[in-house]
């Protein structure tokens, strides 16, 4: 496979209150033979992260075909694992649903942040997502005492498999 460097194809404009800075942690989802939806994480003026997407034709990647004006996934309620932000990291399509695995974070007093893994599901081809719970599906535990982050999920031979980063010392 030969890669062709295209450079920067998207910047947040700052026109949306939820997307003032950054278009980071991209997740690519192929819509048809040449159309792609690219999910990304952005920050608001309070440094909280939310998710949106834009769509391109791979043959004209600098031309934005569609862009969300509202976030598709937002920080959680006060006190939840994702109250400071959400960052999508893995997307799996299974039948008619899309499963978005994301890192939720909050800011405790003794360390800069605390990460856990959440799940949101779309039943409208990835245009919107709904969290399955206010709580994480994976968080610190006796084997992963410091943090869990960045899940990569696949559905293989009727099994869901997750690979993730663990903070060990």
Region annotations inferred by a language model:
Residues 1-84, 92-150, 154-169:
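Beta-rich carbohydrate-recognition and catalytic domains
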């Amino acid at each position: 496979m030969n890669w062709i460097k295209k450079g920067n194809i998207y910047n947040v404009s700052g026109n949306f209150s939820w997307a003032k800075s950054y278009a980071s942690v991209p997740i690519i989802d192929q819509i048809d033979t040449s159309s792609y939806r690219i999910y990304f994480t952005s920050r608001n003026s309070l440094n909280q992260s939310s998710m949106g997407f834009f769509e391109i034709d791979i043959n004209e990647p600098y031309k934005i075909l569609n862009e969300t004006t509202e976030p598709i996934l937002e920080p959680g309620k006060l006190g939840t694992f994702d109250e400071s932000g959400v960052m999508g990291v893995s997307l799996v399509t299974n039948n008619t649903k899309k499963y978005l695995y994301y890192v939720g974070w909050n800011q405790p007093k003794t360390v800069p942040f605390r990460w856990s893994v959440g799940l949101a599901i779309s039943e409208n081809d990835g245009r919107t997502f709904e969290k399955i719970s206010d709580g994480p599906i994976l968080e610190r535990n006796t084997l992963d005492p410091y943090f869990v982050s960045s899940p990569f999920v696949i559905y293989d031979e009727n099994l869901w498999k997750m690979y993730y980063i663990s903070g060990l010392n």
